[in-house]
Regions:
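Rossmann-fold dehydrogenase core element
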Residues: 126-144, 164-168
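N-terminal Rossmann-like dinucleotide-binding module
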Residues: 2-67
Length: 390
C-alpha cells in the first residue's frame, strides 16, 4: 500500500504565479489552457510549451503576442530537467497521457491531465499512488463542470423544485456526416483506437457530471456505436442505475441516461431532460447558426466576449406541477442560466498547489477513478450486450 506524504511546500514561498509548462500544441492549448491561464496572471505563468518540431501551430498565438517570454522546447527532457517548472499540463492524445504524467511526477512536478486521465483504471490508480508518494498534486481537466448549462442544472437540482429525481437524460448530440475529404489518421480523435472512442472523450465529461450529481451507480448498461463506419465508436448510449431517492416509496431504480450521437440531424439538440416527482426540466442547445455560439477556435477562445453567458432564448424550461395529482396543471418558467467560468478550474488548482492541500481540489481522485471504471464497464457492457454491476 502506497504511503501518502504531505504536499511539498512551494520553493520560495506561497502567493507567486505557478510556472507552468504545457505539453501539446493542439486546439486545447490555444482555445482552453492558454486563454484561461492568461486570465489569472497572479496565479499562473506559462513558462514553456513542448513542441517536438515547428508545425506552425503556435504561429497565431505568437503573432497575437500571447506567447511573449514563453520558451518553445523541442524535447520533453528539457521540461523535466527545468527546475523552474512547477506544473506540467498534459494536453496530448489519450494514449500518451500515462507516460507523460508518470515521468512528470517522477521528476517532482505537479500534473494536470486532459480528460480522460489515461486509458485504463490500472494506469490511473498507479499515477495517483505515485503522486501521493511524492507529495504532489495530480488532477484532471474536467472543465465542463464549469459550463453554464451544468452549473444551472446543478443549482436547480439543489433547490429541490423538481422533487425526487426519477430519471434524467444528458446528451452531447451532434450532426457530423463523414466528409468526403475524410482520411484516417489526420485527426487522432477520428482514428481507430480503443482510447479514442467517444466514451473516452465526450463520455468523460458526461460521466463526470453524473458522478458529481449522483455519485457512483449500482449498475451500468451501454451501447457503443460506430455510426459513420470508420472503425471507431463515435457514439454511445449509457444507462447508469441508481437507488431510488431516500424519500421515495418506490423500489424502482433511478436511471440516468448519458448519450452522444454523431449523426443527430436536428437544429436544436437536446442537452438535458430531467423528470422529478414534482416537475421536469428541459434544456436544448442553441442552433449552430446562432450568433451567440461563436465557434470556439484560435480566433474565438474561451475568453471571447460573451463566452459563458447564454442568452435568454437558450435558457432551459422548468415545468412544475401545481398539485401532485393526476392531470395537474403546470407552471412553466424559464430558468436563468448561470455564467460559465472555465478559469474556475485553474483557480481551484492554484489554491490546492499554493496551500499544499490536495483536499481543496474540486476534481477528486475518487471521482476520476469512478469515471474511468464506468468507462471500462460501459465498453464491456456494450461488447457483452448486458447490464453489469458496478
Amino acid at each position: 500500500m502506497t504511503t501518502s506524504v504531505p504536499i511539498q511546500p512551494r520553493q520560495g514561498g506561497r502567493g507567486r504565479p505557478i510556472r507552468t509548462s504545457i505539453l501539446g500544441t493542439g486546439m486545447s492549448l490555444s482555445v482552453f489552457h492558454e486563454p484561461s491561464i492568461a486570465l489569472l496572471p497572479e496565479q499562473f505563468a506559462i513558462h514553456s510549451i513542448f513542441e517536438r518540431s515547428d508545425k506552425g501551430r503556435l504561429e497565431a498565438l505568437k503573432q497575437a503576442g500571447r506567447l511573449d517570454g514563453v520558451k518553445i522546447v523541442r524535447t520533453f527532457e528539457e521540461v523535466l530537467e527545468d527546475a523552474d517548472v512547477e506544473l506540467i499540463v498534459v494536453s496530448t492524445p489519450n494514449n500518451t497521457h500515462y507516460g507523460y504524467a508518470k515521468a512528470a511526477l517522477e521528476a517532482g512536478k505537479h500534473v494536470l491531465i486532459e480528460k480522460p486521465i489515461c486509458p485504463t483504471l490500472v494506469e490511473a490508480t498507479e499515477l495517483y499512488q505515485l503522486a501521493e508518494s511524492k507529495g504532489l498534486i495530480l488532477s484532471v481537466y474536467q472543465n465542463r463542470r464549469w459550463d453554464s448549462d451544468f452549473l444551472t442544472l446543478q443549482a436547480l437540482l439543489s433547490s429541490g423544485k423538481l422533487g425526487d429525481i426519477i430519471e434524467m437524460t444528458s446528451s452531447f448530440d451532434r450532426y457530423r456526416p463523414l466528409p468526403r475529404t475524410y482520411q484516417s489518421g489526420v485527426n487522432w480523435k477520428e482514428t481507430p483506437g480503443a482510447s479514442n472512442n467517444a466514451i473516452y472523450n465526450l463520455g468523460s465529461h458526461l460521466i463526470d457530471q453524473a458522478v458529481v450529481l449522483f455519485g457512483e451507480p449500482t449498475k451500468i448498461g451501454a451501447r457503443c456505436l460506430d455510426q459513420r463506419g470508420i472503425g471507431l465508436d463515435e457514439s454511445f448510449v449509457l444507462d447508469l442505475y441508481y437507488p431510488p431517492a431516500e424519500t421515495s416509496s418506490s423500489k424502482t431504480p433511478r436511471i440516468i441516461t448519458l448519450r452522444a450521437s454523431i449523426l443527430s440531424a436536428l437544429p436544436h439538440q437536446l442537452r438535458y431532460l430531467v423528470k422529478g416527482s414534482k416537475g421536469s426540466y428541459v434544456k436544448y442547445t442553441l442552433p449552430n447558426s446562432h450568433s451567440a455560439l461563436k465557434e470556439i477556435n484560435e480566433d474565438n477562445p474561451v475568453t471571447h466576449e460573451g463566452f459563458g453567458v447564454e442568452p435568454e432564448e437558450g435558457w432551459g424550461t422548468a415545468y412544475i406541477a401545481k398539485e401532485e395529482k393526476d392531470g395537474a396543471d403546470f407552471t412553466e418558467e424559464k430558468v436563468p442560466a448561470s455564467a460559465g467560468d472555465y478559469k474556475g478550474l485553474y483557480l481551484n488548482l492554484f489554491e490546492a498547489i499554493d496551500s499544499a492541500d490536495r483536499a481543496k481540489l474540486a476534481v477528486k481522485k475518487e471521482q476520476v477513478l469512478s469515471v474511468l471504471k464506468i468507462i471500462e464497464l460501459a465498453r464491456k457492457s456494450s461488447d457483452e450486450g448486458k447490464v453489469l454491476s458496478f
